[in-house]
Amino acid sequence: MNKFSVKNHKVNRFSTKAQARQSPPAAPRRVLLFNKPFDVLPQFTDESGRTTLQGFIPFKDVYAAGRLDRDSEGLLVLTNDGKLQARLTQPAQKTGKVYFVQVEGVPDNDALTQLKRGVTLKDGLTLPAGAELVAEPEWLWPRHPPIRERKTIPTSWLKITLYEGRNRQVRRMTAHVGFPTLRLIRFSMGNLSLGNLQPGEWKEITDV
């Protein structure tokens, strides 16, 4: 009887430990909105020593929902919520992403129509997009370093809304219609926007 009791006791202790290992406490859900500065990689580590999110974000359990290239600025959504990441980035969701884009030259109606209808890039025809000529945004912050402008060629601003997310898509689209991108700022993804965040600033939100 004693042998059985001891054996049973050991089994119960083992089972409790196994359950504890199999069911770790769930990490708190986090959703951060970050205004990524120019020349910052959208990741926490880099073997080449370039500037990453590590210098700005104190949490390491979040990941970027969609890319924002090193030479682009603006809204980066960081979260550990897989469902939210999918909603913001999966092509089938067609979540609108708004960009303010400074281009070389002044696009005419033909160029804007091409952007709206879709242009054929190396990876295929782009989805219809929003594209309009706008004034320089009032909330615009200075970029460091500033863009390189040619004195003989004017620049202008476009507001472009994409419903897909290909690699460097905005830059390739504007170049395709003859107006290279000089500066690219993502302002919003779905109903999430920069608001009044300045470069390098972030905030945590819960109502999403």
From Swiss-Prot:
InterPro entries: PsdUridine_s_RsuA/RluB/E/F_cat, PsdUridine_synth_cat_dom_sf, PsdUridine_synth_RsuA/RluA, PsdUridine_synth_RsuA/RluB/E/F, PsdUridine_synth_RsuA/RluB_CS, RsuA_PseudoU_synthase, TruA/RsuA/RluB/E/F_N. Residues 1-26 are annotated as: Disordered. It is an enzyme of class 5 (isomerase). GO terms for molecular function: 23S rRNA pseudouridine(2457) synthase activity; RNA binding. It comes from the Bacteria. The keyword tRNA-binding does not apply. Its EC number is 5.4.99.20. Pfam families: PseudoU_synth_2. One of its GO terms (biological process) is rRNA processing. Keywords: Isomerase, rRNA processing. Belongs to the pseudouridine synthase RsuA family. Responsible for synthesis of pseudouridine from uracil-2457 in 23S ribosomal RNA. This is Ribosomal large subunit pseudouridine synthase E. It comes from Yersinia pestis. The gene is rluE.
